[in-house]
């Protein structure tokens, strides 16, 4: 709530019906979700596959975030063995990474996906606040994704900037799936998220609000043209175009 600059009273009680033409804050009191956010940590991948198969018809061995449409809840299901979560802080960080993404997606109700770079950026930001030694990377189905365990990401970002290889925000907004992420994208989305939260938390909250809870005139969820919405949000919330943001971020990142 602090990052989103929202109050518990902003969200509906889960019983009232939203009226067309009024601000939409979701379907229930849990940042817009009807039911509480859930977490299940199991000992082994076999335990996880058994649970997911019985509950949701899934057979996934690695960490899974899932929207239970019946109960209106977002859940994180993980297991210690497959994800090598053998240290307390690694478990803690991994859980926080995934729960932070669920909270972001669930803000004003999970009716559509938040852009990938913002989800991954917030997940990295929250996890690395706990211990930068341990880092989680999302992957698309059927892919192992990126698995690099460097600790000092500030130096990695500086090297990318110096080499002219740092992604621009326009490139990050165009990423449609985690399979498209290279390591430089992970570094950049983390650093840009940290930059926004550190230098303009009001702007970050404003952008998040603009992207979530969008409705068409008939009241159905509106996930169209999120690329245009993001560009408009940078102008409205940060007072910068994409090139201006890139320049400000690079200057800040080099100083870290």
Report the location of each language-model feature.
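Juxtacatalytic substrate-recognition/specificity segment
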Residues: 1-115, 217-219, 225-232
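Acidic/His/Gly-enriched intrinsically disordered linker/tail segments
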Residues: 61-78, 90, 110-256
């Amino acid at each position: 709530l602090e990052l989103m600059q929202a109050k518990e009273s902003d969200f509906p009680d889960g019983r009232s019906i939203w009226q067309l033409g009024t601000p939409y804050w979701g379907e229930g009191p849990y940042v817009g979700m009807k039911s509480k956010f859930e977490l299940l940590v199991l000992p082994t991948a076999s335990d996880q596959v058994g649970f997911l198969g019985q509950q949701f018809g899934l057979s996934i061995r690695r960490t899974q975030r899932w929207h239970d449409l019946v109960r209106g809840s977002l859940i994180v299901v993980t297991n210690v063995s497959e994800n090598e979560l053998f240290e307390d802080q690694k478990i803690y960080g991994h859980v926080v990474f995934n729960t932070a993404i669920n909270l972001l997606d669930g803000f004003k109700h999970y009716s559509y996906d938040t852009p990938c770079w913002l989800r991954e950026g917030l997940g990295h930001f929250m996890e690395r606040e706990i211990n930068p030694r341990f880092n989680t990377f999302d992957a698309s189905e059927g892919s192992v994704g990126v698995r690099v365990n460097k600790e000092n990401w500030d130096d990695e970002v500086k090297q990318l900037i110096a080499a002219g290889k740092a992604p621009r925000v326009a490139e990050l907004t165009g990423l449609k799936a985690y399979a498209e992420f290279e390591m430089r994208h992970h570094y950049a989305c983390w650093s840009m998220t940290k930059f926004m939260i550190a230098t303009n938390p009001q702007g970050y909250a404003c952008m998040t609000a603009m992207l979530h809870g969008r409705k068409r005139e008939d009241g159905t969820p509106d996930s169209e043209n999120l690329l245009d919405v993001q560009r408009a949000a940078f102008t409205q919330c940060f007072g910068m175009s994409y090139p201006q943001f890139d320049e400000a971020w690079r200057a800040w990142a080099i100083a870290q």
